[in-house]
């Protein structure tokens, strides 16, 4: 019969503590890039949907990560990370 391997790794900080630290970092980054009213509305939506639960914390983390990723990917003006936007010709000549 197989046995589970013994836990030989170093102790990690509790998952809940790490999750709350991640949420705090994401919130701090989000307020630099998005209007507070949008973020407040997102928080209200999450609270109304999930209440005060860990599922709500996980949902808002996932949404903030996606928003920030897309924001940086399309070219944030606050950062050098992202795709440089090229000007498109008005006559549509660049289309194939």
Swiss-Prot record:
Effect listed in the UniProt record for changing residue 95 to Q: No effect on ion channel activity
Effect of residue 67 to S: Partial loss of nuclear localization. Complete loss of G2/M cell cycle arrest
Organism, scientific name: Human immunodeficiency virus type 1 group M subtype B (isolate BRU/LAI) (HIV-1)
Effect of residue 80 to A: Complete loss of G2/M cell cycle arrest. 66% loss of LTR transactivation. Complete loss of human TFIIB binding
Extra information: The infectious clone pNL4-3 is a chimeric provirus that consists of DNA from HIV isolates NY5 (5' half) and BRU (3' half).
Full protein name: Protein Vpr
Consequence recorded when altering residue 32 to A: No effect on incorporation in virion
Family stated for the protein in its record: Belongs to the HIV-1 VPR protein family.
Protein's job: During virus entry, plays a role in the transport of the viral pre-integration (PIC) complex to the host nucleus. This function is crucial for viral infection of non-dividing macrophages. May act directly at the nuclear pore complex, by binding nucleoporins phenylalanine-glycine (FG)-repeat regions. During virus replication, may deplete host UNG protein, and incude G2-M cell cycle arrest. Acts by targeting specific host proteins for degradation by the 26S proteasome, through association with the cellular CUL4A-DDB1 E3 ligase complex by direct interaction with host VPRPB/DCAF-1. Cell cycle arrest reportedly occurs within hours of infection and is not blocked by antiviral agents, suggesting that it is initiated by the VPR carried into the virion. Additionally, VPR induces apoptosis in a cell cycle dependent manner suggesting that these two effects are mechanistically linked.
């Amino acid at each position: 019969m197989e046995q589970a391997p013994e836990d030989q790794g170093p102790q990690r900080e509790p998952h809940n503590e790490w999750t709350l630290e991640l949420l705090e970092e994401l919130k701090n980054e989000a307020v630099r890039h998005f209007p507070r009213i949008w973020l407040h509305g997102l928080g209200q939506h999450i609270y109304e949907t999930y209440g005060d639960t860990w599922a709500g914390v996980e949902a808002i983390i996932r949404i903030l990560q996606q928003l920030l990723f897309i924001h940086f990917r399309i070219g944030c003006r606050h950062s050098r990370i992202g795709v440089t936007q090229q000007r498109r010709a008005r006559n549509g000549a660049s289309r194939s």
